[in-house]
């Protein structure tokens, strides 16, 4: 049993050793020791017992076996008791070790708390140290400044000392130079004295020579020489005085001679003045003759001017009549000006509204800029937050580097001091340069002083030279006295000639000046006279033109007088024939005179209106040109605006995209920052936990190592230990291996966390790069936004200008259209009145040719309807009937709206055919002449009426088209009335506008014959003026049917004078109709162009408004 127990114990030990072999290095050492003991037991088995398998602890029990030769139960019990005691001791030790471990944990926690408090205290101390260092740095900076100031002061003192030394050195050098110069001067004086002794042969010093004299004795020698020179000068002065007396005598003689010469010259000047006066009198006589000629020319010019005034008075009388019309037009212009002023006030109000809109737009722009600024501020705040985060990280890194920074700070301070020293050296160099400049100035001053000293020396030399010159002057005086006597004679002769020449020159200059003044006066007079002659020539030309105009007017007046005389003869003949109508003839003459005056006045008004019309046409053309230019500019601006709007839209889209990207990036940044902070916190917590766990594990390892050492010591010391103790030891080893596994897991976690930290740093670097990129993109977006804001402001200003221009152009076009419509209405009225007056005039003429109307049956259809109408409308005045006639024709003519120009051309062709038929017409009798003239006149009158009605229709159409175009109507709606269907005969016949059916012709004829027989005294003029429209139209058709009969009968006789006048009036009417036709065509084209331009402008304005609405949306 015991052997089995030992075997089981050995197996357990082996199994435990196998289990524990998977542990660390200490467990392997323990197993190796146990295996060594087992091998020893197996080797010693043969000597002790014969059992094949020995127990495990046989080696360890060798010592008790040696002591106790025979093992027994007591021994085993003792051993078991000892092992139990050992186990109890081990359990007690384990409990103690656990208690110690818990105490160590508590102490560690307390130490951690203490360390945290110490860290806080250290931080407080660090802050205090930082404050102390700041104060020390400030104190050090103050000390540095003080040291620098002291260094500056020392440098300044050093510079001053150096300057003093340099000044003293320069003064010493100057004194040396002065000494040398004085020595040279003294040597020169000595040499001069030696030369003076040699020249004069006198000895200055009796005992010594001048070459051996001392410098101190030179003064006495010079004084002696000066005394001697003074004595000689006084002697020479005594000799010069008589020479001066002689010179004064010579001067007095020369003055007397000069006075004589001056008297002679004055006499000569007086002679020349007298001669000059004689010449001036001759010139004045010539000038007076020229003035007389000019006066005669002026008298002739006055006569011509009087004649011109008389003629001008005649013209002024004519102009007075015109001025009355001008006054009326001025009143109209004043009214128009008032209208314009009202419109200008309205435009000013619109400008005030536009300015208010501008201010609103500016406020919107400011708000937009503020919003953009707020966005920029938000971006800057985010960037500042990021910078703060980065600064916090950098501060955490800098906390470890502050000790190194202290050393670097000292080195930086040293570098700063070195830089300051370099700067000071630079300043010292600058001061040295200034010192050099001052030195150069001082040298210049010293040179000037030396030059002054040299000047003094030169003055001394001059004194010595003067002494030599005195002797030379003595000799020269003698020569001069001799030369003076010779030159006096030459001076006298030259003075005489000079005085003569000067007097002659003065006289000539005076004469030249006087002649030049007279020449300038004469030239000015000649210029004035030439100007007057040119003015007179211009007036003469004007008078000639006026005379030619007067002659033309006279010819016209003679022609008119001839016509009037012919008419008077006819009137006299007609008065003899028509005595009954004398009263009416007088009234008609008065009316005729009034009508002539009115015709002349209306002609003048028509001319003025034509002039105004031409001016307005020119203005309209200018406005059209401006409108075209403005349209081109508007098209360009609209295209540019559309392009810019597209660009603005694209940029806005890009900006929105970028803002969305920025927002997403901001959200990502916020999320990343939050995650980063969370990771930081987690990392800090985990790092603290890991530090705590590592510290705990280290303590546990230390305690376990100490326990293992204790167990090893106990196992070595103990013998015969039990398997239970081994199990306890193996349990301890298992706990140690488990704790080592925990330590490995924690190390792997630490590595994982370090890798996570590296990844986080990489992500942080990547986020920094993205942040820099985003900041750059934001800066570019901000610049582009500013550019776009500027471009938007420019576009808005351009749009406002275009709107203002469009409004101005619309107002101008409205004004032009209104003025054009008014002009057209005035022209229509004037033309209608002129046509009415011409009708009255022609019918008055034909009234005076009136007898014999009842004899011919061909006149019955003509006077059929008028005679019947005169019964009912005899009391109605002629003007009202003609007005109703014209208005009815105008209403009938309004039905033709398809092609008015075609009808006008056909009417002109008819008028030309009528004019070509007129010269061939010649009747044998006066009755037939009157019939043909009346028929032709009535045809022409009716054609003129139809043409005037068509013209009024055209004007109404143009006015309606203008108004419809300004109101924004379409091209198909220019005609304001519904089209009226025409008959086939109206479309085929060009003159069928006023033809009617001849169904009622026989009844009309019967009624006409009865009425004419019953009232033979009625005049056809009155009947025509009071006739209705239907009778006139029926008579036109009957007259035209009767034309070939008259043309076949009227080939024999010549044409009468009234027919000639009617032909002239028809030609004039034809010319006027052609001009009116061209005007109507031009006006139609202009109206169409203006309507198209206005529509295009309206379309463009609508497009611009739509674009603005889109932009606002």
Curated annotation (Swiss-Prot):
Coiled coil (residue ranges): 72-183, 243-833, 1061-1113
Keyword Transit peptide: no
Gene3D superfamilies: 1.10.287.1490
Bias (Low complexity): 15-26
Keywords: Coiled coil
The keyword Coiled coil is annotated on this UniProt entry: yes
Annotated region described as Disordered, given as residue ranges: 1-26, 848-902, 955-1062
Biased composition (Polar residues): 1-14, 867-894, 955-974, 994-1017, 1024-1040, 1053-1062
Protein name, entry field: Coiled-coil domain-containing protein 158
Originating organism: Homo sapiens (Human)
Organism phylogeny: Eukaryota, Metazoa, Chordata, Craniata, Vertebrata
């Amino acid at each position: 049993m015991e052997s089995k127990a030992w075997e089981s114990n050995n197996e357990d030990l082996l199994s435990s050793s196998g289990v524990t072999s998977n542990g660390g290095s200490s467990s392997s050492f323990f197993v190796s020791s146990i295996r060594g003991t087992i091998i020893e037991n197996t080797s010693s088995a043969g000597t002790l017992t014969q059992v094949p398998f020995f127990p495990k602890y046989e080696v360890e029990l060798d010592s008790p076996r040696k002591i106790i030769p025979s093992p027994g139960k007591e021994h085993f019990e003792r051993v078991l008791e000892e092992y139990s005691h050992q186990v109890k001791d081990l359990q007690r030790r384990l409990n103690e070790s656990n208690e110690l471990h818990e105490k160590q944990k508590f102490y560690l926690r307390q130490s951690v708390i203490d360390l945290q408090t110490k860290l806080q205290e250290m931080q407080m101390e660090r802050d205090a140290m930082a404050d102390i260092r700041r104060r020390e740095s400030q104190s050090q900076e103050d000390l540095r400044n003080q040291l620098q100031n002291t260094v500056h002061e020392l440098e300044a003192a050093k510079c001053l000392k150096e300057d003093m030394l340099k000044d003293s050195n320069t003064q010493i050098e100057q004194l040396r130079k002065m000494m040398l110069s004085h020595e040279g001067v003294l040597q020169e004086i000595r040499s001069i004295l030696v030369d003076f002794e040699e020249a004069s042969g006198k000895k200055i010093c009796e005992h010594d020579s001048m070459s051996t004299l001392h410098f101190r004795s030179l003064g006495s020698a010079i004084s002696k020489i000066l005394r001697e020179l003074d004595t000689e000068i006084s002697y020479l002065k005594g000799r010069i005085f008589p020479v001066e007396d002689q010179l004064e005598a010579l001067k007095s003689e020369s003055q007397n001679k000069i006075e004589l010469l001056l008297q002679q010259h004055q006499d000569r000047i007086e002679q020349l003045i007298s001669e000059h006066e004689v010449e001036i009198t001759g010139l004045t006589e010539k000038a007076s003759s020229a003035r007389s000629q000019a006066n005669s020319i002026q008298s002739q010019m006055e006569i011509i001017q009087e004649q011109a005034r008389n003629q001008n008075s005649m013209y002024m009388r004519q102009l007075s009549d015109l001025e009355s019309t001008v006054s009326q037009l001025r009143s109209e212009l004043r009214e128009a000006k008032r209208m314009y002023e009202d419109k200008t006030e309205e435009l000013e109000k619109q400008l005030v509204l536009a300015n208010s809109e501008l201010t609103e737009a500016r406020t919107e722009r400011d708000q937009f800029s503020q919003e953009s600024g707020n966005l920029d501020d938000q971006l800057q705040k985010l960037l500042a937050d990021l910078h703060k985060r980065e600064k916090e990280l950098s501060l955490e890194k800098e906390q470890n580097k502050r000790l190194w920074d202290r050393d670097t700070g000292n080195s930086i301070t040293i570098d700063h001091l070195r830089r300051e020293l370099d700067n000071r050296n630079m300043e010292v160099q600058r001061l040295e340069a200034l010192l050099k400049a001052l030195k150069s100035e001082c040298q210049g001053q010293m040179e000037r002083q030396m030059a002054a000293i040299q000047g003094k020396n030169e003055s001394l030399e001059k004194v010595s030279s003067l002494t030599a010159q005195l002797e030379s002057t003595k000799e020269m005086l003698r020569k001069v006295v001799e030369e003076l006597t010779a030159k006096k004679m030459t001076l006298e002769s030259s003075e005489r000639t000079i005085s003569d020449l000067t007097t002659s020159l003065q006289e000539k200059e005076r004469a030249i000046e006087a002649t030049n003044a007279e020449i300038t006066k004469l030239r000015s007079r000649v210029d004035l006279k030439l100007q007057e002659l040119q003015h007179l020539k211009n007036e003469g030309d004007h008078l000639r033109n006026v005379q030619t105009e007067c002659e033309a007017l006279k010819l016209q007046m003679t022609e008119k007088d001839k016509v009037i005389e012919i008419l008077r003869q006819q009137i006299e003949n007609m008065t003899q024939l028509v005595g009954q109508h004398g009263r009416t003839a007088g009234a008609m003459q008065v009316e005729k005179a009034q009508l002539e005056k009115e015709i002349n006045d209306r002609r003048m008004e028509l001319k003025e209106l034509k002039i105004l019309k031409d001016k307005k046409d020119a203005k309209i053309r200018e406005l059209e040109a401006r409108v075209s230019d403005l349209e081109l500019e508007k098209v360009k601006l609209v295209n540019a605006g559309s392009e810019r709007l597209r660009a603005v839209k694209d940029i806005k889209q890009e900006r929105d995209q970028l803002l969305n990207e920025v927002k997403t990036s901001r959200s990502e940044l916020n999320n990343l920052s939050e995650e980063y902070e969370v990771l930081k916190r987690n990392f800090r917590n985990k790092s603290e936990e890991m530090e705590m766990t590592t510290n705990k594990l280290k303590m546990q390892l230390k305690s376990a190592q100490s326990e293992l050492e204790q167990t090893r010591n106990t196992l070595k010391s103990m013998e015969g230990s039990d398997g239970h103790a081994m199990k306890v030891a193996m349990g301890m080893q298992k706990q140690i291996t488990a704790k080592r596994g925990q330590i490995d897991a924690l190390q792997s976690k630490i590595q994982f966390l370090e890798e996570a930290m590296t990844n986080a740093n990489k992500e942080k670097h990547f986020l920094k790069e993205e942040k820099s990129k985003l900041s750059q993109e934001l800066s570019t977006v901000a610049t582009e936004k500013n550019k776009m804001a500027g471009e938007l402001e420019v576009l808005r200003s351009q749009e406002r200008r275009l709107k203002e221009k469009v409004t101005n152009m619309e107002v101008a076009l409205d004004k032009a259209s209104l003025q054009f419509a008014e002009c057209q209405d005035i022209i229509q009225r004037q033309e209608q009145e002129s046509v009415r007056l011409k009708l009255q005039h022609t019918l008055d003429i034909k009234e005076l040719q009136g007898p014999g109307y009842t004899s011919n049956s061909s006149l019955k259809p003509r006077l059929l309807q008028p005679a019947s109408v005169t019964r009912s409308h005899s009391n109605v005045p002629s003007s009202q009937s003609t007005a109703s006639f014209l208005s009815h024709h105008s209403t009938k003519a309004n039905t033709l709206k398809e092609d008015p120009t075609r009808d006008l051309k056909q009417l002109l062709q008819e008028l030309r055919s009528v004019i070509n038929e007129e010269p061939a017409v010649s009747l044998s009798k006066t009755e037939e002449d009157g019939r043909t003239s009346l028929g032709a006149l009535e045809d022409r009158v009716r054609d003129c009426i139809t043409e005037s009605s068509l013209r009024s229709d055209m004007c109404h159409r143009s006015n309606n088209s203008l108004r419809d175009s300004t109101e924004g109507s379409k091209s198909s709606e220019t005609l304001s009335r519904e089209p009226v269907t025409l008959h086939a005969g109206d479309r085929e016949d060009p003159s069928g506008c006023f033809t009617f059916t001849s169904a009622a012709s026989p009844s009309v004829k019967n009624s006409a014959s009865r009425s004419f027989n019953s009232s033979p005294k009625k005049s056809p003029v009155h009947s025509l003026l009071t006739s209705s429209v239907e009778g006139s139209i029926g008579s036109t058709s009957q007259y035209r049917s009767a034309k070939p009969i008259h043309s076949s009968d009227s080939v024999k006789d010549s044409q009468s004078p009234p027919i000639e006048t009617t032909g002239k009036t028809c030609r004039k009417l034809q010319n006027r109709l052609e001009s009116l036709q061209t005007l109507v065509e031009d006006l139609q084209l202009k109206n169409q162009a203006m309507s198209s331009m206005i529509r295009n402008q309206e379309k463009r304005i609508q497009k611009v408004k739509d674009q603005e609405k889109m932009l606002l949306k």
